[in-house]
Structure formats: C-alpha cells, structure tokens
Amino acid sequence: MTKRHSSNRAILILESPWELDYSDSNRTSVLPFVEGVGKLAGDTEVYHANFYDKSSFLKALDCLCKRKFTNTTVYIAAHGYKKKVGSVSISDLIWEVGLRSKECNITGLMIGSCFVGENTSTMEAYLEGTNLKWCAGYSSTSLWLEGTLIDCAILSRMTDLDETDYADKDNMIHHFASSIAAFSDSFKIGRDYRNQPVPLNKSLQFVIQPSGKGKRAKCVSEEVFEVRESLQL
C-alpha cells in the first residue's frame, strides 16, 4: 500500500560529511537537530541525503525534490571556504536549488557553512527569477553546535510562514529577527580569514526576495539585527 503523507511543509537537508575529528566516521550530523524542529512543528516532514561533490549533490537534490509542499526549505550543511560549499561552488548550489524552486515550492535556502555569507552579491543574483524568498549563511567560520542551533531556530520560524508572509519585506525581516532573538549578537560565532574573532551580528547574513512584481533580492542583515535589538528587554 502506498503511504500517504499529510504534512504541509518540508525541510530538505543536503549534508556533506563533517569529519570533525579523526574518528568521526559520518557520526556528526545536523539531522537529529532538524528532526526536532519537525517534531515541534508537527506538520513538517524532514528529508535527508548526503553529498560529496557536484554530481552527488544533484542526485541528492533530485532524490529529495519528489513532492510539492505548501512551504519547502532547503538546508545545505557542509564545510565551506571562500566560494565553495564542500567541493561545490555557491553559485552552482543556489542555481540548482533555484531551478527546482517553482516546481517544488522551495521558498528558502539555509546554508550552514563557513564563509558563504560573504557572497551576498551571489545570493542576490541567483535568487532573482526563482521562487526562493530568502537565503542565509555565515561570512566567517561558525562553531558547529552553536551554528546548528541558530540554523534550526531560523528553519523553525521560516518554515512556519505562509505564502502571504513573503509579500512584505518588513514582515520577513521581523521573522528573521524573532528567530535569532534568543542568541547574543555579540557572541563570537567564529573567525575571519585572518583568524580574528567575528561576532554573530557581523557574520550571519540574510538576503530576501519578497514575492510580488518588481521586488528584487537584497541583503537585509543590518535591518534584521536592528529589529532583533528592539525585541530585547
């Protein structure tokens, strides 16, 4: 008998092995953390596949993009450096997700990788003309556990949005700010290329493309952290 799924939302995880230590035989994974997000939501499916290079990334993405949900978010989790995530260029990743975004109703892309957030111009360019409404990532290195928890907070909030929520820029900014409100903006999330410490509010970058004719993709990181500050006591 064919299994029927009643969930309306989905988080698709594409993860590359972390090898955080010499004995890490694919032990470390974001999967159990994101599964917790799905269980908390109650109506969110979580699907996972590993990738190792561009070819396996494409196969993994096609494997996960089998069904259209009312709201689907892609979470790419892998080591990052300069313009690459794993061994795949950031532009290729966003391009391929964007190609499938309309058919699969993919609205957001969370990239849990070091240094990808320094490429906000690439994010802006490759979001144009797609169904993607947002993309986020870190412009420095990112502590693994702390970064994963922040990613999950963002995924939890943004996956819960409805189509109308993406029409207003300020509304999207407020949802991002609310998702990270519990995290200190001055927390040292990682380091830059010169090994200097970088606080969360200088590392975490947000690019949005609100729905509606004529609306362009734009980096709104400063606005997100300004609103986040207003949510503190």
Segments (PLM) and residue ranges:
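Structural alpha-beta junctions
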Residues: 34-45, 99-107, 128-138
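Short, charged beta->alpha transition segments
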Residues: 60-64, 90-100, 120-125
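A domain-level signal for caspase-like cysteine endopeptidase catalytic cores
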Residues: 1-73, 108, 112
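Active-site microenvironments of hydrolase-like enzyme catalytic domains
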Residues: 72-82, 134
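Short acidic, S/G/P-rich loop/turn micro-motifs used as interaction or catalytic elements
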Residues: 18-22, 52-56, 79-85, 115-119, ...
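A short, glycine/acidic-enriched catalytic loop
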Residues: 79-108
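Conserved residues at the C-terminal ends of beta-strands
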Residues: 77, 112, 138
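Active-site-proximal C-terminal subdomain of hydrolase catalytic domains
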Residues: 116-232
